């Protein structure tokens, strides 16, 4: 089965540079480029948010920087399946390809070289440092966080926060609750660190993760190697931080943490990790 006609290539993550010479290609070898197919990018519409570049221009620019970290995300919709255990991009020779990769659902077949299975370096997104603003962090039933609960808003879900109101506390204790982060721009997310409430024995013991690149797209569950929704194991006390790395990393603007189990109450402090191509 061929790729749906509305599927086009976008490129994300940081400033996008189009080298104009072989020398520029060499000097831009540390540029991070993220390529992925997005089902909702419709029928030849220009990628307005990416500097008015067409999908083909973006593809060629991406592939011209061969030493970049390349991550691919295939979003084929709810009714279609992508059975490959990895995704691939043709960046072998440093030349722009003349066509998109050939992709067939259900066949695990993609032309090109393997994408990055794991990030070489990570850096905190900025929950603990405060660079993530309160309005970037939301939760289920947030309009009901009044009175005492107004001190335990989702914006309090910051790693190592101390004092009263030192975590996000869910007002309801069931599996329909979630905490959501808007990264403003799509980024390469490579891991998550979690803690419980600092002043009481309340924490999340396990959770799942959803993500998407646009609010108009369906949520995608992060899967394990068997194709099932991955269950991440969380905390066992109030203060220790537990790290879960994403292998492979994901391209996302929106991230949702969905608690599956908890001790006493759903309580969360966290930090997200971003994928870096070099230690900085």
From Swiss-Prot:
GO molecular function, one term: signaling receptor activity
A cellular-component GO term for this protein: extracellular region
InterPro entries found in the cross-reference section: FA58C (IPR000421), Galactose-bd-like_sf (IPR008979), Neuropilin_MCO_CoagFactor (IPR050633)
SS bonds (residue pairs): 119-275, 166-198
Signal sequence bounds: 1-23
Domain (F5/8 type C): residue spans on this chain: 119-275
Membrane topology type: Peripheral membrane protein
Primary localisation category: secreted
Places the protein is found: Secreted; Cell membrane
The keyword ATP-binding belongs to this UniProt entry's keyword annotation: no
GO biological process terms, semicolon-separated: cell adhesion; visual perception
Assigned keywords, A-Z: Cell adhesion, Cell membrane, Disulfide bond, Lipid-binding, Membrane, Secreted, Sensory transduction, Signal, Vision
Subunit structure: Homooctamer of 4 homodimers; disulfide-linked. The homooctamer has a flat, cogwheel structure with a diameter of about 14 nm. Two stacked octamers can assemble to form a hexadecamer.
PANTHER family (alphabetical): F5/8 TYPE C DOMAIN-CONTAINING PROTEIN, F5_8 TYPE C DOMAIN-CONTAINING PROTEIN
Protein name: Retinoschisin
Organism from which the protein derives: Takifugu rubripes (Japanese pufferfish)
Lineage: Eukaryota, Metazoa, Chordata, Craniata, Vertebrata
């Amino acid at each position: 089965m061929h790729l749906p006609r509305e599927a086009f290539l976008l490129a994300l993550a940081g400033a996008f540079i189009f080298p104009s010479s072989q020398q520029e290609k060499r000097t831009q070898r540390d540029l991070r480029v993220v390529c992925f197919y997005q089902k909702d990018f419709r029928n030849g519409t220009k990628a307005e948010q990416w500097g008015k570049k067409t999908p083909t221009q973006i593809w060629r620019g991406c592939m011209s920087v061969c030493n970049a970290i390349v991550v691919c995300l295939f979003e084929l919709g709810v009714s279609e399946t992508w059975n490959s255990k990895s995704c691939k991009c043709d960046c072998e020779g440093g030349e722009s390809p003349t066509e998109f990769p050939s992709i067939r659902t259900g066949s695990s077949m993609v032309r090109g070289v393997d994408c990055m299975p794991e990030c070489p370096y990570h850096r905190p997104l900025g929950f603990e440092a405060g660079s993530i603003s309160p309005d970037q962090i939301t939760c289920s039933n947030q309009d009901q966080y009044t009175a005492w609960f107004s001190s335990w808003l989702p914006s309090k879900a910051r790693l190592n926060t101390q004092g009263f109101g030192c975590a996000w506390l869910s007002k309801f204790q069931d599996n329909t609750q979630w905490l959501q982060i808007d990264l403003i721009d799509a980024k390469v997310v490579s891991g998550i660190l979690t803690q419980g409430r600092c002043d009481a024995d309340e924490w999340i013991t396990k959770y799942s993760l959803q993500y998407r690149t646009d609010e108009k797209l369906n949520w995608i569950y992060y899967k394990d190697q068997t194709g099932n929704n991955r269950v991440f194991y969380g905390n066992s006390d109030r203060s220790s931080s537990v790290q879960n790395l994403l292998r492979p990393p994901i391209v996302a603007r929106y991230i949702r943490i969905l608690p599956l189990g908890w001790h006493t109450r759903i309580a969360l402090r966290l930090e997200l990790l971003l994928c870096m191509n070099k230690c900085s």
